[in-house]
């Protein structure tokens, strides 16, 4: 198999490095910055390390490979696909690993499909420097199974989750709401606790509340409790915001929490559930699909 990368930055380099160690010999790349200092020197060094062969144009790259991985940025995903269109054929598998919205992946799929090439939306769910080519990947689209099959001999960790372009990226986007939100909560919380020298005590208190409870159960408890008590919690957050303002600590996450809780209170779920906590997460989500009439 001959594999090509459009874009040979950190992600492309990491994948190529791992694939070389796994025995893949025919790797090619084209990067629009390969002639532009200081990027050119880094790209050249990475190519030498991975044994990747440089292609001067996208046309040359696609003439040499069967599988091409678009490895640029989400903002460039569509334009790169459009640039590749004149040179894609039915013999190509086009894989987009860029971090982009499901709508962008759907657009890229539509562009690629018109050429007869097969498309796979691939969402990388871990750190490339840590995992290299074994980074967990979710794949969707018409070419997802083909992508999994052709990379299996090299140990890539690809899980096919559906045939619809955008599904894989949707999972990554929705997961990021939680993961980046959690980091933001740590930043805001610990910035404030540090002012009072109570870092360990606050973290210890949070740990007591969360440790020992399975994550899915934590999600159920928080959601079922939260929708019934959202209005009270929103008012409590007003005091939190006032405290942070007094300290001169940015309160962006606390304000967002208050607004989210107020929006949740607007569903009227406390009344709908008679003040009692619903027993399942599914009950909560169904009740929140549409506001009460």
Q: Across the structure, where does each feature detected by a protein language model lie?
A:
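Short, basic/aromatic-enriched C-terminal tail that caps enzymatic domains
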Residues: 274-293
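Rossmann-fold NAD(P) dinucleotide-binding segment
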Residues: 58-119
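Helical "substrate-binding/catalytic lid" subdomain
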Residues: 171-277
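Conserved beta-strand segments of alpha/beta enzyme cores
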Residues: 26, 53, 93, 118, ...
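NAD(P)+-binding Rossmann beta1-loop-alpha1 motif at the extreme N-terminus of oxidoreductases
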Residues: 1-63, 88
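Rossmann-fold dinucleotide-binding core
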Residues: 100, 104-180
């Amino acid at each position: 198999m001959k594999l090509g990368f459009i874009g040979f930055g950190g992600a492309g380099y990491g994948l190529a490095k791992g694939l070389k160690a796994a025995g893949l010999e025919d790797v090619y790349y084209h990067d629009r910055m390969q002639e532009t200092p200081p990027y050119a020197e880094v790209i050249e060094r990475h190519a030498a390390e991975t044994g990747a062969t440089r292609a001067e144009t996208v046309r040359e790259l696609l003439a040499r490979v069967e599988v091409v991985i678009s490895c640029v940025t989400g903002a460039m995903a569509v334009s790169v696909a459009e640039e590749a269109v004149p040179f894609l054929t039915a013999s190509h598998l086009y894989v987009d690993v860029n971090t982009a919205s499901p709508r962008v992946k759907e657009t890229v799929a539509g562009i690629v499909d018109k050429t007869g090439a097969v498309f796979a939306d691939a969402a990388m769910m871990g750190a490339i420097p840590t995992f290299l080519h074994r980074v967990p990947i979710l794949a969707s689209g018409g070419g997802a199974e083909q992508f999994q099959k052709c990379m299996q001999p090299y140990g890539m960790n690809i899980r096919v989750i559906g045939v619809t372009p955008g599904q894989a990226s949707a999972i990554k986007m929705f997961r990021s709401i939680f993961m980046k939100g959690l980091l933001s909560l740590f930043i805001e919380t610990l910035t404030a606790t540090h002012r009072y020298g109570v870092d360990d005590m606050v973290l210890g208190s949070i740990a007591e509340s969360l440790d020992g409870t399975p994550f899915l159960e934590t999600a159920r408890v928080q959601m079922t409790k939260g929708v019934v008590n959202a209005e009270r919690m929103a008012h409590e957050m007003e005091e939190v915001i006032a405290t942070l303002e007094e300290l001169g600590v940015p309160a962006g996450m606390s304000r967002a929490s208050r607004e989210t809780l107020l929006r949740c209170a607007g569903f009227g779920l406390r009344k709908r559930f008679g003040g009692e906590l619903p027993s399942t997460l599914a009950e909560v989500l169904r009740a929140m699909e549409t506001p009460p009439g």
